Every structure is written in structure tokens, then in C-alpha cells.
Amino acid sequence: WGPGLNQLVSLHNPQLVRNWWDYKYSKASIRDWRTSGLYIHDVIDINNKWKAMGSARMDFYNYRTATAKVKDGRQEYDEADRSEWKKVKTSAFTGRAGLVYIPVEEISLYASFGSHFKPYNTMYSSRVIYLDRNGKRFNPSKDGGEVFKPEKGYQAEIGVRYMWANRIDFSGSVYYIRKNNVVKNLGTQEEKDETTGEMVQKTIQAQVGTADSRGFDLELTVHPVSTLAVTGGLGWQDYRIRKINQSKDYPEYTDPSKNVRATGIPRTTFYVYADYTIPKGLLKNLSFHLSGTFQDKIFTDVANRVYNPALFLVDGGLFYTIKQKVTLALNVDNLFDKEYFKSTTVYGKPRNFTGTISYRF
């Protein structure tokens, strides 16, 4: 919408709404992420019916941020005008284990368990009151460094797969995901600002939450003939904040999202797509693709029933392969040019076309 619609944007100094909104930037926010890790993975064939898998991983996470004055209000800055870096460094060990049982050739049953971690990039602010995982107030370093411990958790999953004569491929799984050390905003409180000495409203951020997600996934692929594949899938999940530790220092503050369906996540998703390749004749190796995806309504406010409506989009494509080396493709997204919102204030893409040429060596 607006004068920026269908405009070409410069990669060097992008201005989507130029000549309409001439805003001058005063400073740049510089961020740098670096992640490295070591891992080991192995699959063991116990016998012709049992297989086991195990893996271990050590991750090292580094994040830093700084600010700098910009040149002439544009998106350029001098390194000499940059502030000192504020840094977050953390590491974590995670693992995963799985077991597969094959009672007959067409069926396999599996179970898996794995752990995860997710670092927080939170930096100290004098306008925030910080509470640890026990609900106790603490004072982070003002010079940077880790404020909140990383989110940690685990995932457990069981599933089944059935394959028959290259005609049917079915898989289904049920999962449970647990998250600990979830950071929540518990409200505000008026206190004296350490920098200015004035009374200000401070946000209370607390690492007191525990959340979980449970759901299932189903997928079925059918090959009526060798040149046609039809696939359909269904997913359902329920994500909620399950527990919020009560703070002894601030007992009057609670989070209304406890045990309430989470916002920003669709509960049900569904997709179906088909691919057909002409096997012989003048148009041999010409392929057609058609797909449809459904997304359940996404709540932005569960209590007040505010949400983005459910959405169904259709995409299509043509592919032509020459001597198994060169592939020409034309994809059409949002085939029927449906108007929709990607999020509350972001308009979804209209019908759009993408052409590609690829070569396989």
C-alpha cells in the first residue's frame, strides 16, 4: 500500500517510501551473531529389526551489539564513532537419542528424545526490573554480559511409517516439547531511575515461565501411477505457558497468559499438493505442480478474541527438464491473487511469478 508499492529498492541504501517519508536516522544499531559447535553422531544396526541413534553436541554462542552515529542521517556509519561492544557469551551441551523397530518390511515404529537450548540477547536497561528463575530480584552488569540464562528444554516423540510397493507412503507422529527458563513481562512498577533520579515506570522482566507444546503430524503420499504423486498433510499443536513461579518480592504481579492458548501460532495446518510429469511424446519431462495450504486463524489477543482469519492459498508451477541436466521452472505463488494479512499490520504478497534455470553437473 502507498507510494512504495511496486517500487525498485536499492540494495546499497534502501528507501522503500522515498519522496513520501524523508526520515533521518540519528544512530545505527549494530549486531553480530557467531555460533560454533562440535557434535558426534552415530547410527547402530542392532539387528534386522532394531536400529539405534545417538548424538551429542556442544554449542558456543557469541552475540555483541553496539551503536554508532550515522552519516547524514542515512544508513552508513564510521567505525570510529561506534560505542563499546556489549557482549553475551554462553555455551550448552545438548543430546539426542532414538530407537527404531521394524516388525515387518513395510512398517517402522520409532521413539526419540532430545534436548535443546536457546540463548537470550537481553542487555541491561535502567528501565527494567529483573527477576531470576526463582522470582528474586537481581542486578545484571551494566557493562554488558548475560542477563538471563538460556532457555532450555526437551522434546519427546513417537511415530510410525508405512510404505507399500512404491505406491503409498504414510507417516504419523505425536510429540511433546517442554521449555524452561521462559522470560515473561509481569507488569510495571514506579521506581527511581538510577541514571536521572526521576520516578519512572519500569517493566518487570522475569525468567519464571515454563511452557509446553503438544501435537501431532500426519502425512500421506500416494502414487496412482509412476508419474503422479499426490501428498496431503495435517498438523495440530497446542502451545501454552503452563507455569509461572510466583515472585515473593512482587506477589501482586501475575501473567494472564498462564494456561491460555498462545498467540501468534495457528493451531491447525493442512496442505495438499500434486506433481505430474508427462512420460512420453513431444512434451516428455514437462512437469506440473499444484499445491494448497491451509492455516488456522492466528490469535493476537485470545481473551478478547482478536485474530487474523484462517487462510487457504493455492500455488502452481511448471518444470521442464532437458536431458536430465537443465531444468527450466516457472512458479506462481498465490495463484488466485487472494488478499490477506501475513500478520496484524503486514499485507500478504499478491500473485507473483518466479522463473529459474538450473544446471546439474
Predicted regions and their residues:
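Conserved C-terminal beta-signal and adjacent last beta-strands/turns
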Residues: A111, N259-F361
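Solvent-exposed loop segments that connect transmembrane elements
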Residues: W1-K24, Y63-S91, N121-E146, K184-A206, ...
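Residues that define the transmembrane beta-barrel architecture of outer-membrane proteins
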Residues: D32-S36, K89-F93, K152-A156, D212-F216, ...
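Gram-negative outer-membrane beta-barrel transporters
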Residues: N48, S171, Y176-R178, E190, ...
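Residues on the lipid-exposed face of transmembrane beta-strands in outer-membrane beta-barrel proteins
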Residues: L38-I44, A97-Y101, I158-Y162, L218-V222, ...
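Outer-membrane beta-barrel domain signature
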Residues: K27-S29, E84-K87, G145-K149, Q205-Q207, ...
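Structural signature of Gram-negative outer-membrane beta-barrels, strongest in the C-terminal barrel
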Residues: S29-K179, S213, H223, D275
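Gram-negative outer-membrane beta-barrel proteins
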Residues: F60-A68, F117-M123, Y130, N166, ...
